[in-house]
């Protein structure tokens, strides 16, 4: 399912391709690209839930905004988000790429992924997808994109 999301984000969303794509045509295109129908369905449902945030149909969990408070992760969250992922989320909050609401959206979307393995690189892409879809997060998206691609470019040298 995560592979389908990555493909969709890179092919349609990130490249600003035509957003009004017929779902049946999209499913056919993804099937032709080699993805399984169940993964396609799950990815489209995942994106639909993300769109609910964008449209204001779902509100992120409201938490205390005391600057001295610290997010305590549940056991389920710790199983999916290892220490490096949790540390990266904290780092993004500290540099104000994420706020309390967007952090909770990211965590919720990560937990909704149907994947056995989840790494820091995967988290970075989920963060990009969330920020891209939330109105008013354009600057945060741009900062995250710069962070993601600066690090990856640095690895090539």
Swiss-Prot record:
InterPro entries: Smg
Pfam families the record matches: DUF494
TM helices/strands, residue ranges: none
Family note: Belongs to the Smg family.
Protein name, as recorded: Protein Smg
Gene that specifies this protein: smg
């Amino acid at each position: 399912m995560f592979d389908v999301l990555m493909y969709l984000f890179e092919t349609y969303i990130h490249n600003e391709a035509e957003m009004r794509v017929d779902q049946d045509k999209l499913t056919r295109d993804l099937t032709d690209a080699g993805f399984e129908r169940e993964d396609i369905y799950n990815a489209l449902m995942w994106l639909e839930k993300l769109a609910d945030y964008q449209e204001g149909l779902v509100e992120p969990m409201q938490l205390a905004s005391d600057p001295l408070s610290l997010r305590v992760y549940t056991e389920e969250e710790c199983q999916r988000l290892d220490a490096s992922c949790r540390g990266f989320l904290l780092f993004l909050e500290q540099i104000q790429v994420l706020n309390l609401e967007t952090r909770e959206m990211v965590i919720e979307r990560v937990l909704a992924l149907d994947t056995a393995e989840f790494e820091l690189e995967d988290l970075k892409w989920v963060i990009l997808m969330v920020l891209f879809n939330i109105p008013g997060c354009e600057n945060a998206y741009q900062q995250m994109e710069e962070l993601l691609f600066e690090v990856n470019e640095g690895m090539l040298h």
